[in-house]
Amino acid sequence: MNVRRLIPAAALAGAVALGATALTACSGASAGTGTDGKLHVMSSFYPMQFLAEQIGKDHVKVDTLTKPGVEPHDLEITPKQTGQLGESDVVLYLKGLQPAVDKAVAQSGVKNVVDAAKLTKLEVHGSSGHDHAHEGEEGHAEGEAGHDHSHGEAGEDPHIWLDPVKYAEVAKGVGTALGKADPDHAADYRKNTDELLGRLTALDTEFKDGLKNTATRTFITTHSAFGYLAERYGLDQEGISGVDPESEPSPARMKELQAVARKDNVSTVFFETLASDKTAKTLATDTGLKTDVLDPLEGITDRSQGADYFEVMRSNLKNLQKALGSK
């Protein structure tokens, strides 16, 4: 079983300082606002959009490069979006998740760029929670079962928003960065950030309490996006594919998962809403398991089990409790 990660208080406090350094190339000047009087923020995809909206509220106009229903990993930037990116006051993105965005941001010339990957510590997670590499360990069973994880630096997992504690660290940094870009409204950004942190703390408590006592600690999912969540709450994630949802599992990996399902009394194979459920259903049929949704929250659509981050995360919690046999 994964060892629950303990985040030192100093690391949590450090997110505020990181927010200042993550706002790059500011030249000591604020971003200014558009003709509508709002700070124009371009976000890379939904979790970044949600933070900007919750922290900026009425003071910001938030657009996103990844439209609802688009799988973020596969995003291609259009010329129109490139132009919009260059005209933004602030760009908020997560380096390592979307190569096309990384390239466009680097070429945009925008002075106020906030990289969420610099606001918390990224880790390496494999497809299997049983041989997961923890913080400070050298090496990793990279390419396990034929998977090639190309995200982040040295295969780091970018799915930080699925851990409410790490997402809170990012929120702190975003609040600090928006305040630096728009100092006239810095007090409101601090207030809104504090409100959001309170909600994320409550969500963390719900997950801790809701997953404390379960019949099994192992879950199988098509997309290995839940490494941070699993580690936070003492669970074992077994991914059919790696952190890239489009990668195909090898026959050996499918056979291994069948053995894991029997050994760990797994009842459910999870799939997501933005990618094909074919592989999940194949494995479920072969092993006599059920299927259900575990949403990596990379976008909100009419198929999502909730209208925003908090609603979908609580749906994920309920689905995990049911699958794991919460007592």
Predicted regions and their residues:
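Extracytoplasmic metal-acquisition and chelation regions
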Residues: 2-327
